[in-house]
């Protein structure tokens, strides 16, 4: 999975009113990976996707897909991309099957009923193929959007906020669908405001803010590099203050005054936990239980955006 399928080089976009939506972005996306783009509203993620998909023209820079330029080889690159928009853009009075098969014709592809049947079955839509869209739930309509985007057999799938407005159960269901699609060799790029979504399914994460890429990193590595763990030491009884002998650990007394929190770097050679527990014992405190909590991608994201805004 080392081959770069999408190569973005010094891409920028400035609108007529002077607004700079993208500031010389460079990014490579690997073939067969799930790449999550995170960013606050107005960060530039939608503009970036729109340029790659040929909807918006860049002001400068280049994008190639499998070696083809998105402007010089527009038809070639567009046929390799499937786009699932956030809005439910579907013909409500048409059947599921007709919605999906019609999309294939828009790319100049000949009818291929076996392929349409395959993706409808893959997305658990085959038994609903003759139903009209207006009869389906929101979650099923979103599946139809994915089926439409896959109808012309693209090798890249863009998902713009794929689980926006759906409940937790449907969201997790959608994650499973994305994982299954990846197994077929499709490269998946998703934008999301649900940071746990990126944490759960993405191989790599790119954080975009104010038109710039702040960081691109493997999800696990980002969590490892910037993640901290919190150790909560639960006590057998209340204490009014943390003993002075424990000052060096920068502990925080819990709200119930029956626990103390210790934050440490997971990358450090020595976390200091062993010494801390011994010093707690020496201070005469009685331990009841220990709990650890890993820093989340959400906390890291907020931290990165805050740092970028302060520059």
Predicted features and spans:
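Conserved ABC transporter NBD signature motif
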Residues: 61-72, 77
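Conserved ABC ATPase "signature" region
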Residues: 101, 105-128
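ABC transporter nucleotide-binding domain
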Residues: 175-264
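Catalytic Walker B motif of ABC-type/P-loop ATPase nucleotide-binding domains
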Residues: 157-160
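Short, charged/small-residue-rich alpha-helical element at the C-terminal edge
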Residues: 231-304, 311
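Conserved catalytic motifs of ABC-family nucleotide-binding domains
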Residues: 153
């Amino acid at each position: 999975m080392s081959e770069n399928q999408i190569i973005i080089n010094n891409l920028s976009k400035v609108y007529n009113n002077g607004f700079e939506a993208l500031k010389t972005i460079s990014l490579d996306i690997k073939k067969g990976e799930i790449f999550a783009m995170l960013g606050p509203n107005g960060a530039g993620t939608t503009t970036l996707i729109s340029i790659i998909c040929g909807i918006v023209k860049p002001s400068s820079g280049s994008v190639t897909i499998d070696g083809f330029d998105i402007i010089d080889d527009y038809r070639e690159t567009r046929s390799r991309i499937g786009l699932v928009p956030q809005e439910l853009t579907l013909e409500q009075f048409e059947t599921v099957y007709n919605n999906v098969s019609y999309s294939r014709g828009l790319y100049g592809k000949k009818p291929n009923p076996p392929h349409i049947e395959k993706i409808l079955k893959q997305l658990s839509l085959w038994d609903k193929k003759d139903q009209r869209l207006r009869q389906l739930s929101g979650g099923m309509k979103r599946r139809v959007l994915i089926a439409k985007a896959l109808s012309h057999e693209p090798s890249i799938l863009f998902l713009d906020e794929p689980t926006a407005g759906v409940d937790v159960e449907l969201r997790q269901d959608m994650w499973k669908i994305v994982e299954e699609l990846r197994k077929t060799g499709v490269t998946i790029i998703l934008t999301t405001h649900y940071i746990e979504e990126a944490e759960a399914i993405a191989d790599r994460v790119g954080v975009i803010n104010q038109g710039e890429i702040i960081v691109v990193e493997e999800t696990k590595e980002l969590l490892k590099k910037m993640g901290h763990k919190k150790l909560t030491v639960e006590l057998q009884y209340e204490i009014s203050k943390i003993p002075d002998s424990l000052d060096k650990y920068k502990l925080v007394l819990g709200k119930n005054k029956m626990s103390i929190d210790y934050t440490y770097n997971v990358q450090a050679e020595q976390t200091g936990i062993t010494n801390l527990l011994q010093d707690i014992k020496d201070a005469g405190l009685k331990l009841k239980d220990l709990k650890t909590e890993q820093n989340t991608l959400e906390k890291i994201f907020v931290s990165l955006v805050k740092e970028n805004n302060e520059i």
